[in-house]
Amino acid sequence: MVKYEDKICLFDAKGNQVAEDVPLEAISPLNNPTIMGMVKNIKRTVAVNLAGIEESLAKGKIGGKGCQVPGTNIELDVIGDAEAIADKVKSILQVSAGDDTEVKLINGGKQMAEQVPSKRLDVAAEYSVSMLSTGMALKEALITNFNIDMFDGSTVHSAIMGQYPQDMDYAGGNIASLLGAPSKLEGLGYALRNIPVNHAVATTKKSLMNAIAFSSILEQTAMFEMGDAVGSFERQHLLGLAYQGLNADNLVVELVKANATGTVGSVVNSIVEKAIADGVIVVDKTLGSGFNMYKPADVNKWNAYAAAGLVAAVMVSCGAARAAQNVASTILYYNDILEYETGLPGVDYGRSMGTAVGFSFFSHSIYGGGGPGIFNGNHVVTRHSKGFAIPPVCAAMCMDAGTQMFSPEKTSALVGTVYSAFDEFREPLKYVIEGALEVQNKL
């Protein structure tokens, strides 16, 4: 039995209607089989750069920048023997014949996607088992395949694992995970938010609506883990996922179409008009000047509408510039204008606006330490919004025409190549909708 009466219409990445009157809870991470599968597979999937390992060993460059050790170079045809290495890795990691261990060679054997069996995750406290098991299995496979002696074994280890265990972030290594190391988490429950914007953009191959969906799915699923989407607040996060992340009722696409030649301010006008027309907000009082103050008839839905408008405003503004740099100021001033226009709180009740202030400073302005694409929901600057600030940044980076120093191609090439090989990661919108249709009559 469903807890909420909300029904939504679902649309594909091109804005074509796929389903109508779907229960809101069909997209919940607690019910949707695709989202459940995505979370599980993100935890057990590791990207391996076989070409990088071969190059590191050939040049003696192990452990990252500035770590070239003359005389330690080893010539191995890792790419040429990729199939044998992959088979050996699978045989080491497999718990039982026919289990869900998966090893997939990509790009002619230059990269490898490895999924550890679920049983290894089941007996682990957290997801580090995937990276560590894969790294150790790959090390043994290389040592066995190429008859590496005891004196060069540590060099092979470093070519794979980088500076681990001295650095728990695998600095200079040739394996990667979407989630990163647990030691980097800003707080409890932040693991699914520890995915850089550029990783999401690269994984979805810069598909705008899919990148937004991918980011929103993980950000809002993290809210369930963090205890935010519990009790009275669950519906708020489900509606946010639906309207901002999954383009429910085609709201985002319609806003963008209506403001194709518009501005951030015109998007604000459109979302306010839409909220009034749908009865989401109503006039509270009219001032002597004729200015209307509004109140929400449904505060959670108002937040969801505002969040959808935020993504649309970023698409209009950053899309016009073909550049992502103004995404922070767009998030900030969309909310600022929206609050002045209605007298109501902006997206996430002020948290997204507050996030944008710090985000503006640290993504350019006086400091300018990194572009928008390197931030994530676990970052000390952008962690404060409860799942609503990172999806718009993903939208901006999808539309960037190469203006960024920290581009997805530069920061996320390995992750993008490997994770995009899995359909549900590359096209999450399509498969989450399929999952919703699968369970909608079972709720």
Curated annotation (Swiss-Prot):
Assigned keywords, A-Z: Cytoplasm, Methanogenesis, Transferase
Cellular component GO terms, alphabetical: cytoplasm
Enzymatic class: transferase
Gene Ontology terms, MF aspect: coenzyme-B sulfoethylthiotransferase activity
Keyword Flavoprotein included in the entry's annotation: no
Matching InterPro entries: Me_CoM_Rdtase_asu/bsu_C (IPR008924), Me_CoM_Rdtase_asu_N_sub2 (IPR015823), Me_CoM_Rdtase_bsu (IPR003179), Me_CoM_Rdtase_bsu_C (IPR022679), Me_CoM_Rdtase_bsu_N (IPR022680), Me_CoM_Rdtase_Fd-like_fold (IPR009024)
Stored SUPFAM superfamilies: Methyl-coenzyme M reductase alpha and beta chain C-terminal domain (SSF48081), Methyl-coenzyme M reductase subunits (SSF55088)
Positions of coenzyme M binding: Y367
Enzyme Commission identifier(s): 2.8.4.1
Catalytic activity: coenzyme B + methyl-coenzyme M = methane + coenzyme M-coenzyme B heterodisulfide
Cofactor note: Binds 2 coenzyme F430 non-covalently per MCR complex. Coenzyme F430 is a yellow nickel porphinoid. Methyl-coenzyme-M reductase is activated when the enzyme-bound coenzyme F430 is reduced to the Ni(I) oxidation state.
Residues binding coenzyme B: G369
Biological process terms in GO annotation: methanogenesis
Pathway assignment: One-carbon metabolism; methyl-coenzyme M reduction; methane from methyl-coenzyme M: step 1/1
Subcellular location: Cytoplasm
Cofactor: coenzyme F430
Leader sequence segment: none
Presence of the UniProt keyword Metal-binding in the record: no
Family: Belongs to the methyl-coenzyme M reductase beta subunit family.
Function of the protein: Component of the methyl-coenzyme M reductase (MCR) I that catalyzes the reductive cleavage of methyl-coenzyme M (CoM-S-CH3 or 2-(methylthio)ethanesulfonate) using coenzyme B (CoB or 7-mercaptoheptanoylthreonine phosphate) as reductant which results in the production of methane and the mixed heterodisulfide of CoB and CoM (CoM-S-S-CoB). This is the final step in methanogenesis.
Subunit relationships: MCR is a hexamer of two alpha, two beta, and two gamma chains, forming a dimer of heterotrimers.
Name this polypeptide is given: Methyl-coenzyme M reductase subunit beta
Species for this entry: Methanococcus voltae
